[in-house]
Every structure is written in structure tokens, then in C-alpha cells.
């Protein structure tokens, strides 16, 4: 079981992929007319005056801007952003920012008969195009946060009182159902996977519940791993956060993975961090 941002994929340059997608929708999409609140939030984060934390307001804003989009249009929007250059690196697009050493771990597990799941706080419909562009996983093994889906003709009618018609289409409803972090990761794993993982990989406090659940009363040998953001030269690391997580690993029996000390490369040949830039960890 793998977390995504900061575990398999670049987490903050200067912030999360899903929020940068929000900025693109609000500031760069001529087909969209943002509200004053959305515009202020997007401008503040793009200028780095105020990058939001993982709050309910952040989640609400991110979902509202896509309300009414078809699933096909939204996937195309995500894929378009994936093709844009990565702001803080040379030689890499937004959708290519996977940690190569972690992809090697995934490949090794798949080659030895393991089922590999991704369990992330990123919205499921954002997560799938990115993950499936690189990993040979079935889409149902890519688990993220969930938001409402509606039939175009449904309006405000409750789903129990509405029948989907042959001529209808699905659109994004713009409201959160569950943010897949902390204890919510455990609940989602029980509902969607149905068996306890034997390996769990994370990188932050929002993954602790997933690791504890994996290690608790497991009938099989189980291990938990935390990726440390301790590389300040090749990545946008944070020494303080990395050291805090290293200490937590020692106290909880998790295995630390050091970007700085354990990885010969992060993104591969030809990819370099731009001089004079600073990430958002």
C-alpha cells in the first residue's frame, strides 16, 4: 500500500499537484469564470504569499471549480496539466515527477506476485490519470479522496429519487465525500480492499494511521516505511520535517527511507533542480 504525494511522486513544488491544478483552472483556463474567493486564493498561492494547508476550505475550493465538468473533460484537463513543464526542475514535465527508486520497489513487488495499491489524499479522479500513466495497475487499485458525481439532468434531486437515463452523462458535483487522510485511509482500505496490507509506504503524519493499521495484529509479517524529505540538493526537502519523521520511525518500528542517503537518483538522468528556486515543504 503506497501513499502518493511525497512517497511515489513529487509532493510540493511549490505545493501539491491538485492545488496547482486548481491554480491552472482559475488563472489560466479562459473557459472558466472564477468567483472572487477562488481568484484571491489562486493569486495568493501562485505568488507564494499564502499557500493553503490541508483545510476544509482548501478542499471545498478545489472541488467547486470543476462542478459541472464531464468526467471526460476533467480527465483531459488533468492530462493537459501533466504535459506542462515542472516549474522547479529542468528536463521534467508535471506528470513525470515520479521517484524512480520507489518505482523500482513497485516493479519488484509486482514481479513477485504482490498486489500494489495507491492510497492517497489526492482526489481519485485526479490521481488515476497520473498514476496509470506510469504504473501498470488496474484503476480500482488507485484509491483517493472522493467527491460527488451527478447525472447532468439530476440537478438537486437526491440520488435515491433519480434514475440515470440512457441519454444522460456524468458530471462532477463539486462537493467532498471523504478526504482520504489519516483514519479515513484505514476506513477506505477496509471498505475497498478488504484485507490488511502487509507493506505500507508513506511519508508524513497523514499516513501514520495506514502504517499502524498495517502493523497491528497482522497474521503475516508486515512492515511500514516512511520516505524522508531530507534531500535539499536534488529535491525540495525539509531537514526539520525529515529529522522529526526519522525519530518517529525509531519510536514506532517503521523503516526510514532517506532520499539523500539511500537513492542514487530521484528523477533520473537529465532532471535537475533549478538553481535559486525553493519548494513549499
Over which residues does each language-model region extend?
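C-terminal cap/substrate-recognition subdomain and adjoining C-terminal extension
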Residues: 76-281
Amino acid at each position: 500500500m503506497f501513499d502518493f504525494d511525497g512517497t511515489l511522486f513529487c509532493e510540493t513544488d511549490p505545493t501539491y499537484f491538485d492545488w496547482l491544478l486548481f491554480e491552472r483552472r482559475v488563472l489560466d483556463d479562459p473557459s472558466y469564470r472564477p468567483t472572487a474567493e477562488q481568484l484571491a486564493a489562486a493569486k495568493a498561492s501562485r505568488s507564494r504569499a499564502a499557500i493553503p494547508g490541508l483545510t476544509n476550505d482548501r478542499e471545498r475550493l478545489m472541488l467547486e471549480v470543476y462542478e459541472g465538468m464531464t468526467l471526460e473533460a476533467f480527465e483531459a484537463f488533468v492530462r493537459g496539466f501533466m504535459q506542462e513543464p515542472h516549474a522547479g526542475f529542468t528536463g521534467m514535465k508535471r506528470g513525470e515527477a515520479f521517484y524512480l527508486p520507489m518505482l523500482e520497489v513497485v516493479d519488484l513487488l509486482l514481479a513477485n506476485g504482490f498486489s500494489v495499491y495507491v492510497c492517497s489524499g489526492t482526489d481519485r479522479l485526479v490521481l488515476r490519470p497520473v498514476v496509470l500513466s506510469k504504473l501498470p495497475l488496474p484503476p480500482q487499485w488507485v484509491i483517493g479522496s472522493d467527491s460527488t458525481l451527478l447525472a447532468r439532468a439530476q440537478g438537486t434531486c437526491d440520488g435515491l429519487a433519480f434514475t440515470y437515463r440512457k441519454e444522460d452523462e456524468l458530471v462532477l458535483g463539486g462537493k467532498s465525500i471523504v478526504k482520504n487522510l489519516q483514519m479515513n485511509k484505514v476506513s477506505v482500505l477496509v471498505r475497498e480492499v478488504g484485507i490488511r496490507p502487509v507493506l505500507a509506504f508513506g511519508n508524513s503524519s497523514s499516513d501514520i494511521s495506514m502504517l499502524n493499521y498495517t502493523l497491528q495484529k497482522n497474521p503475516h509479517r508486515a512492515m511500514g516505511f516512511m520516505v524522508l524529505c531530507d534531500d535539499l540538493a536534488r529535491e525540495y526537502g525539509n531537514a526539520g520535517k525529515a529529522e522529526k519523521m526519522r525519530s518517529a520511525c525509531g519510536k514506532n518500528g517503521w523503516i526510514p527511507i532517506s532520499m539523500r542517503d539511500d537513492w542514487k537518483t530521484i528523477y533520473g538522468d537529465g532532471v535537475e533542480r533549478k538553481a535559486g528556486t525553493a519548494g513549499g515543504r
